[in-house]
């Protein structure tokens, strides 16, 4: 939004970078039909780009040198949510090569396939994350049945980006509602959250466009 190119985006992101969040940042330049992947560590920074491929991300970098030198992350641990989700993204990209559009992206964000269990089972390892349904929780982040997951979704194609538009859905993309009272009744150990928890209903995909 504030950059003139992928290189300009990388410049903005690198300025004042303290390395506090080693991660993958995805960017698209609709004018050049080009996409990029910026991996931003403190000392290890990489920028890749393509005009006929794809990049995916799931809250961690994939550059081996960056992972090795600046994190304690284990990219081989499929049980970790980030690794499982990255694996699922790669599967979906391969299965849908040449067929990815807005509708497909919306389906992907509502995906419930767990690559560890090899079946549909919404939990912390699925793209449409449902930590609240997982007895494992999200280690180092959320306790078993913790109230967390993927509850905001946004999709845009090149034509929409050129018009500063996108479609978004609040709540789970799968359409499942989260009801606070039901969750607290099922997990009384979380009763201390009663004053904080709110329902999170799933809302339909809606188009948003910047005003002229």
Where are these regions (language model features)?
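C-terminus-biased signal that marks the final domain/tail of proteins
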Residues: 1-212
């Amino acid at each position: 939004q504030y950059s003139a190119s992928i290189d300009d985006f990388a410049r903005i992101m690198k300025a004042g970078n303290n390395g506090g969040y080693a991660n993958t940042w995805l960017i698209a330049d609709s004018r050049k039909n080009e996409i990029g992947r910026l991996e931003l560590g403190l000392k290890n920074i990489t920028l890749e780009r393509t005009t006929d491929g794809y990049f995916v991300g799931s809250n961690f970098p994939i550059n081996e040198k960056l992972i090795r030198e600046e994190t304690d992350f284990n990219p081989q641990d499929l049980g970790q949510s980030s690794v499982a989700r990255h694996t699922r993204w790669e599967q979906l990209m391969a299965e849908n090569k040449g067929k990815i559009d807005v509708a497909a992206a919306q389906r992907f964000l509502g995906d419930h396939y767990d690559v560890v269990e090899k079946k549909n089972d919404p939990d912390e390892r699925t793209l449409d994350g449902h930590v609240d349904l997982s007895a494992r929780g999200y280690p180092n982040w959320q306790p078993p049945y913790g109230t967390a997951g993927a509850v905001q979704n946004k999709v845009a194609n090149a034509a929409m980006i050129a018009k500063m538009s996108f479609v978004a859905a609040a709540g789970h993309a799968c359409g499942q509602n989260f009801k606070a009272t039901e969750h607290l009744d099922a997990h009384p150990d979380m009763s201390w959250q009663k004053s904080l928890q709110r329902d999170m209903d799933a809302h339909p995909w809606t188009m948003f466009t910047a005003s002229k």
